[in-house]
């Protein structure tokens, strides 16, 4: 695994890559408030061992990438999609298989629409396209998730507590949640 910081337009994005750059690339885009490490290292290594070049990265306001004043993001979903293209450019990748989870899936869809020539395939996990005909999220889930904010990413206890609360909401009622 190799870490690389990509800098452009007063933005810096932290990336990590696995495997040979000449192999077909899979770009992994995680969701809101989730670091690239949610794409576990073992998962990335297994994909690279199958002949792929893997890139994972932290979106803005997450992990080692640029952060903004709390509650005042200075970017849009389209900017996040353009960030992904900047990542591909930094690795000199013309086209990639793009995998997006949650908000990463929204970013992936925007990439496919704005930059179709850069996309080999897309894979979407736990995401939506905001079509008004789709069923809506339960209001208590939306409310709970909107109230869970991490104000200090350097405070490990705050981060862990927030992710436990978030996971508790997302697990639903079918399974027992183990906080340990």
Language model region names:
Residues 102:
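Catalytic nucleophile serine of serine hydrolases
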Residues 105-116, 122:
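Short glycine-enriched nucleophile-adjacent loop
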Residues 142-180:
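Alpha/beta-hydrolase
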